[in-house]
Amino acid sequence: ALPIYLQVNKVRQAVPMFDLIHSVDSRKLLDEIEKVATKHDKVQDVLLQVNVAREASKTGMSVEEFPDIRDYAKTLPHVRVRGLMCMAPFFDDPEEARPIFRVANALYEDMKGYFEEGQIQYLSMGMTHDFEVALEEGANIVRVGTAIFGERVYY
């Protein structure tokens, strides 16, 4: 399964292709995933993306929006929430991301009480520069593309 940030207008193409969508951050996106997954007779696994750090440059719902969207997602028969995703800001010292990862882990652990036992399994947080701290704080999915492929080249 590949992680992607999903725009509403791309749901139609993404749902048949992806096992797990990592970037669900709104009711609007949930509604579109539900509609397309229904047409494909599929239950689409998703991670709810929370912008714990409140960074304007990052997507994701606010911590305050999280309970409402989490509860709404639970009502959709063709959407299955599997966990949480968050991205910390880039810090020169990865330790500075630790408080953000702790909040995300607390939300993740709390989620487990709202869904069927065993349904919430994934905490996706941490990237090449801070994945070790993320793992220490409970991540079980990390994004380390830069470590594998090198820096992105923009043309």
List PLM regions with ranges.
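C-terminal helical cap(s) of enzyme catalytic domains, especially alpha/beta-barrels
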Residues: 135-155
